[in-house]
Design a protein with these regions (language model features):
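N-terminal first-folded block
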Residues: 15-19, 23-41, 49-50
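Catalytic phosphate/metal-binding cores of nucleic-acid and nucleotide-processing enzymes, i.e., regions
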Residues: 68
Length: 152
């Protein structure tokens, strides 16, 4: 199982997204994603997302908020468990990201991007403030179904 984080950094009605267009053999090639990545040994989810956001964007996050958990069984040959965060407080200047092109996307345009099918489903839950635990099943690049539990 691969443990990872994902964060949607918010500022002035926009969300920082990365267009994954720089790395060879990237499973997310051509897609738009929030920032995040895999845990390093001994990290908490919060430590992981703060480190990943800094490495990918140059921004230092303060008090990222855990808003959901995602499970992707057998996605590209691995089971992925992803801690989803939002962040409103940060400092720093954007860098030339090694992951792709960074862009502040107006929130109303987020679902118009080339996203994974699952993102179209769970991203509105984030905006509604619903804490969720969801499993999304893919066959190749096609989502086959999902289950979700909401927590109050």
């Amino acid at each position: 199982m691969i443990l990872a984080t994902l964060c949607y950094i918010k500022h002035n009605g926009c969300t920082l997204m990365v267009h994954r267009n720089k790395k060879a053999n990237d499973i997310h090639e051509g897609k738009w994603n929030g920032l995040g990545g895999k845990f390093e040994p001994g990290e908490t989810p919060e430590e992981c997302i703060i480190r990943e956001a800094y490495e990918e964007s140059g921004l230092i996050l303060y008090s990222p908020k855990l808003c959901g958990l995602l499970m992707f069984p057998n996605f590209k040959g691995n089971d992925w468990y992803v801690f989803v965060f939002t962040a409103m407080e940060f400092t720093g200047e954007l860098i030339d990201s090694p992951e792709g092109t960074l862009e502040w996307i107006p929130d109303e345009n987020m679902l118009d991007l080339n996203l994974w099918q699952s993102d179209h489903i769970f991203m509105p839950w984030i905006g509604e403030g619903k804490f969720f635990s969801a499993k999304f099943e893919y066959e190749g690049d096609t989502m086959r179904g999902y289950d979700v539990v909401f927590h109050s």
